[in-house]
From Swiss-Prot:
A biological process from GO: proteolysis
Annotated S-S bridges: C147-C188
One Pfam family linked to the record: DUF3586
Record's keyword annotation contains Signal: yes
Protein name: Cysteine proteinase 2
UniProtKB keywords: Disulfide bond, Glycoprotein, Hydrolase, Lysosome, Protease, Signal, Thiol protease, Virulence, Zymogen
Gene Ontology MF annotations: cysteine-type endopeptidase activity
Similarity field: Belongs to the peptidase C1 family.
Amino acid sequence: MATSRAALCAVAVVCVVLAAACAPARAIHVGTPAAALFEEFKRTYGRAYETLAEEQQRLANFERNLELMREHQARNPHAQFGITKFFDLSEAEFAARYLNGAAYFAAAKRHAAQHYRKARADLSAVPDAVDWREKGAVTPVKDQGACGSCWAFSAVGNIEGQWYLAGHELVSLSEQQLVSCDDMNDGCDGGLMLQAFDWLLQNTNGHLHTEDSYPYVSGNGYVPECSNSSEELVVGAQIDGHVLIGSSEKAMAAWLAKNGPIAIALDASSFMSYKSGVLTACIGKQLNHGVLLVGYDMTGEVPYWVIKNSWGGDWGEQGYVRVVMGVNACLLSEYPVSAHVRESAAPGTSTSSETPAPRPVMVEQVICFDKNCTQGCRKTLIKANECHKNGGGGASMIKCSPQKVTMCTYSNEFCVGGGLCFETPDGKCAPYFLGSIMNTCHYT
């Protein structure tokens, strides 16, 4: 899936320490040829390949993943690894289909630190263990499929929990609405949870449809056009804001214990062959995957977080993974975020006077005659995310997102349908027709 190193997945939490009893690396499938294991893998997961060349490549991928599995097992005595449904994929294929892309999260932290409200947490009394699944705030595990939409599943899972904890019924909400409609993110090519919250606030008054009325269909990597059929779509929840949570695990635990599941980003490179137990040596090189933090347990020998993934219930511990607390394992403490739901809100009933308007964003646009944004310049202030009629039957809109500004013109006065769009870096000079342009976003 598709920008900083900050935060881009059920069974009851129990204190299970698998200790050194887990099979050491050399003991995993010892004595069984890789070709025989591959044949068993194909039968188990119904794999059939079109050509001999593809079969040979898939076998090579499988053998490489066996090596990686044994390496992970050797470093993680409290976890168990094994052959999973991903084993015929190359590392590059796995990353492209199931991870978000480091570039997105690398820019996100810088942008978020500058522009988003930070939440405070009471660190004085953090419970020893919390599991929001036991309290009814978590929907069943879902499956993103071969689509880099983890960001949408992370954001939606967080909203589901926040909606429930604001006093409403737990309802499964639509990831497809974000994947197909959210033009601040990139569908199956990746995205960010904070941008998803922003898009909802700026384009739907914070409303998110139910999964039943707008089901997920992008598991094969195809993203259909956005559906706006008001007769078929049902609003399931509404958010009125979002927050950044302190990037320390103690602050995260305190906030989660009081407020519910947290959308986080992490490095999921160690997850391909994970089966069960607690990861204690998780790769932490770059953020590449969005997940949902639903609980933790500090009562046993190895304290751990409980994380809801979006790879289906046949992965990990019925769709979940446990990761050691206290050492920023998998970089999980670097991008913790949450939507906010007003307790009095009810789906489809709020008015503009009841829900605070999104924070205004102004764009300072400088258009110049030269190529360096220095000569013959004209400066204009434009309100972002608002349709501006141009007087000739058309209109334009300008939008801000991390590190870029998008300008679109439309042949209608409502800024709907396909527009002609042009992107520039935020706050940097760029070529523009025979001269240059610089768009700078100001968050008021």
